[in-house]
Curated annotation (Swiss-Prot):
Biological role: Cell wall formation. Adds enolpyruvyl to UDP-N-acetylglucosamine.
Gene: murA
Designated name of the protein: UDP-N-acetylglucosamine 1-carboxyvinyltransferase
GO molecular function annotations of the record: UDP-N-acetylglucosamine 1-carboxyvinyltransferase activity
Entry-annotated residues carrying 2-(S-cysteinyl)pyruvic acid O-phosphothioketal: 117
Binding residue positions for UDP-N-acetyl-alpha-D-glucosamine: 93, 307, 329
Pathway annotation: Cell wall biogenesis; peptidoglycan biosynthesis
Length: 419
């Protein structure tokens, strides 16, 4: 099994090209099921979850051609299976996003209950309740969600009990082909939801309120394929910016989207970083200074993203001062803390809050990745730890970061993949 071996590295310096956003690419690939003609998606990152999504679409009978250079073409003309099996779904939570498109276009869907990162319950009841309000008959048995509808789904007024990115995306795709108007209140406002909505509009969907907490979808009878470019990955961007801040370096993230990262950029500036942005680039310069501690509280967009919490834990571990980090989105999302403590971090957990006293340096150790973003935080810690750090179970990392070791090497880091 692959591992990453990391040696203490100089301050990161140079340019890094940001990949397409995994969390936008996955729902957009699933939206291909809604299109009656060929659908071409570009800027798709080369990641395990993307490969799993392509396998799932092929398993349903869709033709999926990987055209190279981050382009994927999907044709549904021979789609004739409506079951997303356990062996595919268990490795990737986003498989649940096939439910809305299959049900809306074909009236039937059997989807195994999902797997993915083990960071809390992440219930699917919001997805199911919304689809039931649109007329679906749903039962959960033998580990599968079995959904049926006679004719088309019907437009409905849906109020989400809590903000859920996945449920918003599933219901948005389902509503695009429903009969009548659907209103989704308390909808997620994440940039990846906006990207999906813009893709659906390019296919012919009628959606207003994009980017707000109230989405209005006027269902249409059919959607056509189009060519669509996936947005840049804001979490990958943020991860590299934090790595540069922790190593007291200066880097530029190219093909990035500064507008999607305002809360993260604000916290990096609070930590002492000098940040300059252009339309599609972000430069961070620590001017050789140690970062200052910053308090963080995760929240749905436009608040601070939960997917950047672990990386800021590392920043605070090595910062000047004391900070608290409070996680409000997922339980179980401090699994990186025991690993960082093994490297010498001064951290204490109190419920959903982590109290961190900054220290001067960490010591290299053998550590274990437990989920996608936790593994990124351990890599960043390894860059500044004395000696050698080995990060085990990096298959988690490969689910969300494209060519991570090559990108770090390009910035001067001592990182290599080993067996």
């Amino acid at each position: 099994m692959d591992k990453l071996a990391i040696q203490a590295s100089p301050p990161l310096a140079g340019d890094v090209i940001i990949s397409g956003a995994k969390n936008a690419a996955l729902p957009i690939l699933m939206a291909g099921v809604l299109a009656e003609t060929d659908f071409i998606v570009s800027n798709v990152p080369n990641l395990r979850d993307v490969s799993t999504s392509c396998k799932l679409l092929r398993c349903l009978g869709a033709e999926v051609d990987e055209l190279g250079n981050g382009q994927i073409r999907i044709s549904t003309k021979n789609l004739n299976e409506f079951c997303a099996p356990y062996d595919l779904v268990k490795t990737m939570r986003a498989s649940i996003l096939i439910l809305g498109p299959l049900l809306a276009r074909y009236g039937t869907a059997d989807v195994s209950l999902p797997g993915g990162c083990a960071i809390g319950a992440r219930p699917v009841n919001l997805h199911l309740h919304g689809l039931e309000m649109m007329g679906a008959k749903i039962e959960v048995k033998e580990g599968y969600i079995k959904a049926r509808v006679d004719g088309r789904l019907k437009g409905a007024h849906i109020f989400m009990d809590m903000v859920s990115v996945g449920a918003t995306e599933n219901l948005l795709m389902a509503a695009a082909l429903a009969d009548g108007e659907t209103v989704i209140e308390n909808a997620a406002r994440e940039p990846e939801v906006i990207d999906l909505a813009n893709c659906l509009i390019a296919m012919g969907a009628k959606i207003t309120g994009v980017g707000s907490a109230t989405l209005r979808i006027q269902g249409v009878e059919r959607l056509q394929g189009c060519e669509y470019r996936v947005m840049p990955d804001r979490i990958e961007t943020g991860s590299f910016l934090v790595a540069a801040a922790v190593t007291r370096g200066r880097i530029r993230c190219l093909k990035a989207d500064p507008a999607s990262l305002e809360s993260v950029i604000a916290k990096l500036e609070d930590a002492g970083a000098k940040i300059t942005t252009g339309e599609d680039w972000i430069e961070l310069d620590m001017e050789g200074k140690r970062p200052k501690a910053v308090n963080i509280k995760t929240a749905p967009y436009p608040g601070f993203p939960t997917d950047m919490q672990a990386q800021f834990c590392v920043l605070n571990v090595l910062a000047q001062g004391t900070a608290t980090i409070t996680e409000t989105i997922f339980e179980n999302r401090f699994m990186h803390v025991p690993e960082l403590i093994r490297m010498g971090a001064n951290m204490e957990l109190e419920g959903n809050t982590c109290i961190i006293q900054g220290i001067e340096s960490l010591s290299g150790a053998q550590v274990m990745a437990t989920d996608l973003r936790a593994s990124a935080s351990l890599v960043i810690a390894g860059l500044v730890a004395d000696g050698k750090t080995i990060v085990d179970r990096i298959y988690h990392l490969d689910r969300g970061y494209e060519h991570i070791e090559q990108k770090f090497q390009g910035l001067g880091a001592h990182v290599e993949r080993v067996q």
